Regions:
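Hydrophobic, Leu/Ile/Phe/Ala-enriched alpha-helical segments that form helix-helix packing faces
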Residues: 32, 75, 86-92, 101, ...
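Terminal accessory/anchoring regions of large secretory-pathway or extracellular enzymes
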Residues: 146-174, 178-180, 189-192, 196-201, ...
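Aromatic-lined carbohydrate-binding/catalytic grooves of carbohydrate-active enzymes
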Residues: 178-182, 186-308, 312, 316-318, ...
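N-terminal accessory beta-strand-rich subdomains and adjacent acidic, glycine-rich linkers
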Residues: 1-161, 168
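Alpha-helix-loop-beta-strand connector modules within alpha/beta enzyme cores
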Residues: 241-250, 255, 341-366
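Glycan-recognition surfaces
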Residues: 268-289, 293-301, 305, 347-406
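Structural alpha-beta junctions
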Residues: 37, 50-52, 207-209, 253-254, ...
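Short glycine/threonine-rich loop-to-helix capping motif typified by GTGT followed
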Residues: 333-344, 382-384
Length: 406
């Protein structure tokens, strides 16, 4: 159907209704008869004259602000990857078109690029529709801002709009999250020996750092990368023989202590491999590890229990929860099977993080939880209170750009 310049369609039998939901807002609702449909999706297409538009920004664009073409691969967004907002602006930094979507949890595919034949910006949006349970209705709101304002002002409007229409709210930020942090990764990589860490923390504390984030390596004597030894989450005794005493010595320096966990991985060499090797989204042979499937309640319970026990046993102040974006999306996941209590990966990850947040804040209300790009969207920010730029070793420019983008 064509509705005020929008071509809206579904690739399966569905009734479509469009209506204005506010200035620049279009609410699209689909209803259908429950049945078996192959890769059902909602498609929305429209064109915008390419006038006074020179640049494009979206949350994971990095240093590339160039306009894309209509044949470029679409940008994927989901609960744990990016955010559904795209801003097109001119040389002066003035907004010419900002596109946002109320769907901040499930997968969306965005293709907004130059169409050479007629000099327009061809906008194509695809939303795979989950056919789970008894769902026979789906609504989504498309926001298009054309006001002449600074593009960062348009983005602030989108952030406020998300809170209103998607019921997303950030996790409270403790004071400690705003103070200087020292991360051990580039200093030590996996060579995280307690005495060396404590010596570095002495210097860090003198320079004003108030928290240390001890990264990958504390849990294994193997320092050859990969994640084959993740999953047991006990300190390597030859590196950190007494974790609680080690944390206490860092606390005595006036620093808080955060610990790294690769949330998704259970390693082939861990004691838990036999338990969880049949509860995986996929097996990463390079990493020598499996990616846990959070649709199984046993997986979620194991992860929550792991963090709760660590917090209690070692008096930690926070967690660096890594690789959450590696859970991926439902369209790439194995079929639903017996033992799962969720059909959608995105919903299961949301449930996992809800349980983690509630369990940890019940024990320590000012707990620090760090996430990184790419999982920085409006829905996931309710579960973390520190967000960092993706790894960019010795690349100060990418780091600065990433900080601004965050």
């Amino acid at each position: 159907m064509n509705w005020k310049g929008l071509e809206v369609s579904a690739n399966f039998p569905a009734e479509i209704v469009c209506e204005e939901a506010g200035t620049g807002e279009t609410c699209i609702t689909l209803t259908w008869t429950k049945g078996e449909y192959k890769a059902p999706a909602l498609n929305v297409t429209w064109a915008v004259p390419l006038v006074d538009i020179q640049y494009e920004w979206y949350p994971l664009c990095g240093r590339d602000r160039a306009l894309r073409t209509d044949w470029d691969a679409p940008i994927h967004t989901s609960f744990s990857t990016g955010a559904p907002v795209f801003c097109f602006y001119n040389e002066a930094g003035q907004n010419r078109l900002t596109i946002a979507l109320s769907e901040v949890r499930l997968e969306a595919l965005h293709s907004y690029g130059v169409h050479e034949e007629d000099g327009t910006l061809l906008c194509c949006l695809k939303l795979p529709l989950p056919m789970t349970g008894s769902a026979e209705r789906y609504s989504v709101t498309l926001l298009r801002l054309r006001e002449n304002m600074r593009y960062e002002a348009a983005l602030r409007q989108v952030a406020a709009w998300w809170e209103r229409v998607s019921d997303t709210h950030p996790m409270p930020v403790p004071t400690a999250a705003r103070l200087p942090m020292y991360s051990t990764w580039y200093s030590f990589h996996q060579e995280t020996v307690a005495a060396d860490l404590e010596a570095a923390c002495v210097l860090a504390a003198q320079d004003g750092f108030r928290t240390v984030i001890v990264d990958d390596g504390w849990q294994t004597s193997d320092c050859t990368r990969g994640y084959g030894y993740c999953g047991d989450w006990q300190p390597a005794p030859e590196k950190i023989p007494d974790m609680r005493a080690h944390v206490a010595r860092v606390h005595a320096l006036g620093m808080k202590y955060m610990l790294w966990y690769s949330v998704v991985y259970v390693g082939e060499h861990s004691r838990h491999w036999e338990t969880f090797k049949t509860m995986l989204l996929r097996h990463d042979t390079w990493a020598h590890a499996g990616i846990l499937d959070p649709r199984f309640p046993q997986v979620r319970a194991f992860l929550v229990d792991t963090y709760v026990k660590a917090l209690k046993a070692w008096d930690l102040d926070g967690f660096k929860l890594d690789f959450i974006d590696s859970f991926g999306v439902s369209s790439d996941a194995p079929p639903v099977r017996e033992g799962m209590d969720y059909a959608l990966v995105e919903e299961a990850v949301c449930r996992l993080l809800t349980e983690v947040r509630e369990a940890l804040t019940a024990m320590k209300p000012d707990i620090l939880i760090e996430f990184r790009q790419n999982y920085i969207g409006p829905a996931i920010r309710g579960f973390g209170n520190m967000f960092r730029v993706a790894d960019c070793p010795a690349d100060w420019l990418s780091n600065r750009v990433g900080m601004v983008d965050l």
